[in-house]
Amino acid sequence: RQSLRLLSDGNDSXDIRHLSRLLDNLGSVDQQFRQLRHSDSPAENDRMGDTRIAALETGSFKNTWQAIRPQLNLESGVFRHAVRLSLVVAAACTIVEALNLNLGYWILLTRLFVCQPNYTATKSRVYQRIAGTVLGVIVGSLVPYFTPSVETKLWIVIAGTTLFFMTRTYKYSFSTFFITIQALTSLSLAGLDVYAAMPVRIIDTIIGASLAWAAVSYLWPDWKYLTLERTAALAVCSSGTYLQKIAERLKTGETGDDIEYRITRRRAHEHTAALSSTLSDMSSEPAKFADTCNPALPCSKPATALTGYISALGHTAAKCTKNAAPTLPHSSTLPPNTPPTSSNTCPTWDPTTFRRHWIHCAANSAPSAPAAAEHKATSSSNSSNSSPGSSNPTTAPTDKFRTGSPKTQPEKISAFW
């Protein structure tokens, strides 16, 4: 490093800058190797174990049963879907065998592909399946006219099968379109009457799609409005637990992400995402539930905002704790021998000011003129009563992050929470 420093004096060339950057990278690699040398120590392993979230191992039968057992009840959407799927598949097989349908397996395949765990996904699949089948039948009926040779039909079968697997995960209507062309072309190669199979294909698709729609509508339907109250309660409670964990870390001055804190943080985000997904699914449920769904739709925005503000508070608390110094700006107001924690260095708001600003932020609108004047007067009063060396605890955040027009009244949000 000294030789490179002497060489770079008065010589600012690109080669010297590249050598300096390479030397820094080599030093970083050397430091990582030095840390790996001591990574096998028990203390290091214990510390690393505290920062990981253990996943449930399913390699043995015991662990597999522990993962499956909580789902064996009607409150589990997975269990309801499994029972629903089994019953409708049995009904489809019974219809095919009783009526002795030649191509009746198309009903079973439609039923298996279309039926989804919830009403919204099944409804979308029903429309896509019928539309793709009808268009595929129209295009497939033209194949014998333009492709009389066997080689061309084989290429169409290969292309249709390949495109089916390429599009089945992100655009189901396209995959249905391609597989219908492939099926009709395969029947033409087998020497069967394609034009006699076309109406059968459409009828079987409609029967299978109707069975799938009836199953999700009447066999333990997964109407989201039935679980909305519980989902919202879980979102609020998990966010409250997350906030409580942050407050405890502020009091103790803890900086590490232990496993309990990470689990609490993950659950808060998962429950908030579940609430948003529930409200999104409710918007596409039948119109007869509109009276229940419409008043609940504005709940997603304040719930997401609440979790976001708590996450920002946790990040700020970690930075305050990390940067806490033994000599604090207002250490004269603390009792003797008080440890320097982030709760002593972070600014605080009184409950009224915090509640007012949270409501305005959740509504995505700037505070009104009277509220701003009142907050300014409160800030001036608190700053005049504070010590000369202390920071202003009531400084309001800037409005540069508030964008968009208000969509929800602050009073309604306050009443909801």
Swiss-Prot record:
Its main location: membrane. It holds the Pfam family FUSC_2. It is found in: Cell membrane. GO terms for cellular component: plasma membrane. Residues 366-417 are annotated as: Disordered. Keywords: Cell membrane, Membrane, Transmembrane, Transmembrane helix. It is a multi-pass membrane protein. The chain crosses the membrane at residues 87-107, 130-150, 177-197, 202-222. Residues 366-398 have a biased composition (Low complexity). The keyword Transmembrane helix applies. It comes from the Bacteria. InterPro entries: Memb_transporter_dom. Belongs to the YccS/YhfK family. This is Uncharacterized protein ORF2. The lineage of its organism: Bacteria, Pseudomonadati, Pseudomonadota, Betaproteobacteria, Neisseriales.
